């Protein structure tokens, strides 16, 4: 049975009966949270996780939806005489169940890491051949999320079936525990994961590891352009490199199973503010998980205001669960120091009948850009209702909090501004159905039938608009 048939059938059932195509009932929207790897790598500890969770809560990010706290590699000291994984007592003196209890008591969800190989990527014991006992270890310790990597896999890759079977072993083991555990594959898109990932998992990485560069080429990330089927994914992949690889994959993702473009680099490295906005916007558009990769205890104000932009998060968490499609891509002569220069239009429908678009400027100069309704509603036929209607344009970044408000929140460790959205009190689905203005940006104009949406987009930047049918 083909993936396309499964996806369409599941989508039809979802619309008719309100059920989910998720293989385990989880991942109805892309996961949100924090992972230590991008900033801390192997420098992990109980104190780091619990202090980070406290900070995420204090500055309002938990109530915006960032609820998974994910412990990455380097947490174990090996296996005991029974073959059971053992947490490093120097790093986690009270054990993993203590970490889980603290997180759960504060309304977080706890994530851990292993690899579908003999070892993890950092050389710690992997789970290949130990799937059931390791799944039971995770369940026993209150784990809600497993990131499952691809290192030291003993050559068990090369065909989709080979990789599928290796990752399915852990999927089956997790399900046998009886504990709901979000299953996040990290096999770098190897062996066409987007075709089979949703059968056994809730998300799957589709490229090599991200790096905080907008479009810098790197020989360690050898595949470029639209090379989504990359036999050697590598690492140090730029934002644009990953985004362009993801362009054709949206059709294979949706409710219950998401393409994972890797953790967010907002607040990591030296990206400009426009680059960070573009990065966050495009991950939201394609329905990638929104996993913070930064040190939240040392976030700059501008990065915090990006992570807290509820009108953009609402695109990512839209109940319809449709990833954006890249409508067009044009190379331009205004190239940056790496010889890169392109512009793109992305568009996707939303659950309430709205449409969201991103005009992405990958050139080195601010430039005027436009989009016609025919491009925006790219699947509509001539004379359709979408093309014959007028649409109000809402800028999804226009209501971004300023640095003064962000600074007050970060310094006082408390959200006092009532205009900030709280998804714990009112979910994004509920807020959208109630037309909560904080989720819709600011109206800046209207585009009429046959007209053009015109704007100016900064270099390495994005214009992100929600279109609502004019009344």
UniProtKB/Swiss-Prot annotation:
EC number(s) stated in the UniProt entry for this protein: 3.2.1.22
Entry-linked Pfam families: Melibiase_2 (PF16499), Melibiase_C (PF17801)
Active site: 149, 209
Keyword Hydrolase recorded: yes
Residues noted as binding substrate in the record, renumbered to the chain: 72-73, 147, 205, 251
Signal peptide: 1-18
Any single GO BP term: melibiose catabolic process
SUPFAM superfamilies linked to this entry: (Trans)glycosidases (SSF51445), Glycosyl hydrolase domain (SSF51011)
PANTHER family the record matches: ALPHA-GALACTOSIDASE MEL1, ALPHA-GALACTOSIDASE/ALPHA-N-ACETYLGALACTOSAMINIDASE
Record's subunit section: Homotetramer.
Protein name per Swiss-Prot or TrEMBL: Alpha-galactosidase
